[in-house]
Amino acid sequence: MSLGPVSPPVNGPVGPLERGLAVLCELTRLAAHQGEAAVRPGDLVRGTGLARSVVDRVVGTLEQLGYVRLDGREVGLAARLMELGNAYLSASGLPDALGPFAERLADGLDESVSVAVPDGDGARFVVQATRRRTMSLAFRIGDLLPAERCAPGALFAAEWDERAWAAWRARRAADPLDAAYPAVPPRHRPAADTGFEARVREAARTGWAADDQMIEPGLVAVSVPVRDASGRTACAVNVVSHTSRHDAASLRAAVLGPLHAEIPAMEAALAAPAEAARAEPGPPGRATAGPAAGPGAEDPARAAKRELGAGYLQSLARGLTVLRALGAPGEEGGGAPHGRTLTAVAEATGLPRATARRSLLTLVELGYAEYAEGDGRAFRPLPRVLELGYAPLGDLSFTELAQPHMRELVRAVHESASLAVLDGGDIRYVARVPTVRIMSVNITIGTRFPAYATSMGRVLLAGLAPGERAAHLAGLAPEPLTRHTVTAVPELARVLERTGRDGYALVDEELEEGLRSLAVPVRGADRRVVAALNIATHAGRGSAESTLEELLPALRTAAARIEADLATASAHHPLGAGERVGA
């Protein structure tokens, strides 16, 4: 079967997909270059060259999909967008196969270790095992570096053909200051001859490459290749240090032995998912996000189009669903290391084959996917997918993920909302969105209260394993904070049992007279309770029953949205700096 030639998509029926990807790239660029969490649509018009009406329709569609967030007149990336990058990472199999080796090397060497893959004439990071110090040295998953300014780049360039070298020279001529690479400090003037070609020849001869402060002063790194079954370099494992601990020569002496010792096992692990995929192809699986699809199901994009009208770009929504489906797990679990056939994609998304084919060919044309005629006629996502917001969104902390949903909750119920974690026998507030009232609850980040007397504390204690909960209660000596505080340990045990069954806790004037609080758990990807979300109100604003009826549904919805973002953001790496919660 021939797929036929790929036509330029911009003026075709899937032009909206290309325009949508352009808007996402510009949002990412602005977030990376300017540190702008949110931008005006006019900024996107200037950056993409698209008409304002087109940008508005693209943004409206992306908001409906949950990939961007609107706050007044500003547009920002939303954490759910990371599911597109997760599709590539799952399909590649690299985090699962090589992540444990990176962690082990980082532990043994006490340095940050990463894995990078070739992406055009650059190196893009896909695995990160960070050692955090005052002087932190690490790249983010999704960051793209120019090949000539990093150690992995020399290893990848050793296998370039003349066409790839010509593309590299053209890129350097067009972008001499590396403005297209927000992950590296921009050059102040065009670089003279970097000696890159000589370093590439040396890397091909020795089997390793070094970065001696090419990215920025103080940063040194050593990389070695990890090869696939055909002998080609599939990726590079990279150790990063600082000149306060190593120079390039001492780092090389310290890490090359341990790196080379791990390479055979890493290459075997990299081959294992591919062999398993050949032996047990399994069912195609369905896309992991959005409404369920499949044969006989209504296309979610069509339903949204019918509801929202001309402002909704159905081709954009379908194209992103197709991209997500390339990394969706099959029923046997895991990603799709050898990609998916056109038939499998159509079945996973519920789209007609012709519709799925158009989207796939557009993704191939734009460099987000490839078609392997000789490998089961499968489509695979490519590392470029990670340019769609993955690196800046990967920097978000747990509290930063939660804040947008907390703001929506406060707007809906007109009461203050807080997020807390268990810290010994106390709860500690890690995020808060207040409301404006004449009478309001005044609490700041870092505030601590006894867990036994708070709704969030009871939710968190109820989420402990039975043995942990019993040990906590055994060491408890509750004091009455008001005349309503439950202080009898057996009664507290019963309250926690009920909280666990009900999935919420309502505390009425036990912490402070006049204060009522309702809390629900926030669970990580493993379904453990990792935090609690609450709404605090004055006890005089209604009965406890009316509080439950009016506030609990909205509170549970907000918690579910936080959980969804937490699962997406932590699927392949820990959350960014800030308050860390297990997931």
Tell me what each language-model feature is.
Residues 2-86, 268, 297-392, 560, ...:
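N-terminal helix-turn-helix
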Residues 4, 137-215, 438-511:
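Short, solvent-exposed recognition segments
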Residues 8, 31, 199-201, 206, ...:
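Juxtadomain coupling helices with adjacent low-complexity linkers
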Residues 26-29, 61, 97-108, 159, ...:
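Amphipathic alpha-helical regulatory segments at dimerization interfaces
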Residues 86-171, 386, 391-475:
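Amphipathic alpha-helical effector-binding/dimerization core
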Residues 205-211, 223, 229, 235:
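Extended serine/threonine-enriched, polar tracts that run as long, contiguous segments within proteins
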Residues 217-225, 513-521:
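A short beta-strand signature within small-molecule sensing/ligand-binding domains used
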Residues 227-233, 523-529:
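Flexible loop/coil segments at beta-strand boundaries within sensory signal-transduction domains
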